[in-house]
Amino acid sequence: MPHPSVRVEPGPAGFRRVRLDRPDRRNALDLGMVRPLHAAFAAEPATPILLDSADPGVFCAGADLTVSDAERAEISGLLYQCYEVMITRLGPVIAVISGPAVGGGAQLAGAADLRVAGPDASFRWTGPPGRALAVGAWLLPSLVGRGLALELTMTGRWVDAAEAERIGLVNRVYTEPGQAAAVLAKQLADQGPGAAGAAKRVAAAGGLLDRLRAERAANQAALAEPAAPQAQRDR
């Protein structure tokens, strides 16, 4: 039986743990990961989720760059559906980030309601070379403000854990982020099931979903175009 690249198992305080587990590809997102990931978030939408990686050295390297253009477009479309489910589901989502989170991986972390990071966490909001893609422009203004959001998406520069905490990209940085997330999960559970859903409904208002859908449509159109010649040579 093939090893599952997304594992769903019981987590702390009644949470369901959704664990990325494709260490040979640094949790790069192919259809074999994105389909069960979407299913895990869509199932039992009132159940809270803890999202983490089985490999503490890497959260997610983004979309798998070795797949075909057609599969890449399908992965992108499913990922944006996944982000929308994460935002609109009633149960809260806590992301535990250790190591790098790049492109679609950075968006997975950002789409969580709460983000707990280790000191080795880092983020980069960039897409595959040769593609005019917006990566996280729908989300980052709500987290760090418009000006910094545009800087991060336009330059694709790295953000380390200390800066991520300072600018509001993560809630907190802890030496043991998994343990801290378990404490946070208990705190949320103590508030009862309705409080988180009520807060999420209000936080998703005001254009967030409109921006998500606009970015998804723009990126689907861009992925339908041939890659730039240099990017084709680099593949």
Describe the residue ranges of each PLM region.
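Crotonase-fold acyl-CoA enzyme core
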Residues: 2-7, 85-193
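A structural preference for short, pocket-lining loop segments at secondary-structure junctions
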Residues: 11-21, 32-70, 85-96, 114, ...
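Glycine-rich acyl-CoA binding loop
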Residues: 26-30, 105
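Hydrophobic alpha-helical membrane-association signature
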Residues: 33-36, 78, 215
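A short acidic, glycine-rich active-site loop
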Residues: 69-78, 149
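Hydrophobic alpha-helical segments typical of transmembrane helices
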Residues: 78-82, 136-139, 148, 195-198, ...
